[in-house]
Every structure is written in C-alpha cells, then in structure tokens.
C-alpha cells in the first residue's frame, strides 16, 4: 500500500477545517455537530474521524487557525525588540491589534465569540476544547507584552502614571475585551445600542491607545 505523504494529510485536514468553518458561519458554532461537518465535506464519516475524533478537536483546531492567522505573534515579538521609544512600540502593538481584529471580523470572530461564550457556560467543554489548543492566544499575548513595556518603563520613571498602574492595566484589558465584544455584536449580529451606528474597531483601539498615553502621563 503506497505511503500517504504528510502534505496530503495536511491538505485533507485543511479541507475538513474549511468545511467546519463554513458550517460555523451559517449556524451558531456551539450547535455544529460532526454530522454537519461530514455532510459539508462530502467525505465519509470515517474520512473525517480519521483527522478529528470529536467536535471538540475541531473547535480547538479552528481556534488555533484563528490565532495563527497573519503571523501576529511573530509581529509582536519583532515590535518588542525594536530600538524605539516605549510609546512608539506601544503604538505599533495597538496598531497590530487593530489590523488583526479587523481581519478576524470578516473571518473567525463570530466563531471565536460563540465558542468563548459557550466555554464560559460549559466548563467541561472548555477543558476539552482549550486542552487541545496549541497556538498562543493573540490578545492575551499582546496584552502581556504591552504590560511589560508599561511596567518596566514606569519603574524607570519614563512613564508617570496619573492613577495607580494596576488600574491602568485593568482599564486596557477590560477596554480591549469590551471593544471586541461590542464590535463583534455590532458587525456580526447587527446589534447596536440606542443612538449608536456601526462601530469602527480601528477608531476605538486608536482612542484606547491615546487614552492609555494620557493615563501614563504622556
């Protein structure tokens, strides 16, 4: 029997994930079943289960694909070693977040939002899904790197926070979370608050950067 190449195996795996992605775009991700994915691929049940043994492994792979999209972790690492001012590096980190989030809105963000909500409500599913993910989550990593710059440069006296530093760091993380949530609801589900039209994620993140600089005394 001829040996199947690794390239072929990766192509079949990608084919199944692409099918799962399309199903998740049409219905709530947490309602997708392995049967849905088998039907979407046109493969046999065994042909799908050879690569993914349950829906949790599919979810984990989709989350990994989202976090690997665009190579943002590498971009963040490159920003962190630049010989530039702290505020310039922070601005680049926030800009990278803008671009990544904009790309996610037209691709994975609906799926990520639905799965994160599902995992919060179902701890067992959370363990089964996130226990299989391998890629570094982008936004927590970005927040960690931004925090490292802010903390270290506050310790040197470069930044002079106008309120306690822990409050600023909490503000940044909670603001990012709020922007991601509200823009996702607005653009993926057409939900908006009274008097509020379409939200612009780039303007919101840019405003967050400017607010952060003010809070840091710059």
Positions of the model-derived regions?
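N-terminal intrinsically disordered/low-complexity leader segments
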Residues: 1-11
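Helix-turn-helix
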Residues: 15, 23-65
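Hydrophobic alpha-helical connector segments
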Residues: 61, 75-108, 165-172, 202-205
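Amphipathic alpha-helical packing segments from all-alpha helical-bundle domains
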Residues: 78, 88, 110-114, 121-156, ...
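Short helix-coil transition/hinge motifs at the ends and kinks of transmembrane helices
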Residues: 81-82, 122-130, 186-199
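Helical hydrophobic small-molecule/effector-binding pocket
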Residues: 87-124, 144-147, 173-180, 184
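C-terminal peripheral helix-coil segments that are non-catalytic and often amphipathic
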Residues: 99-100, 140, 144-156, 170-218
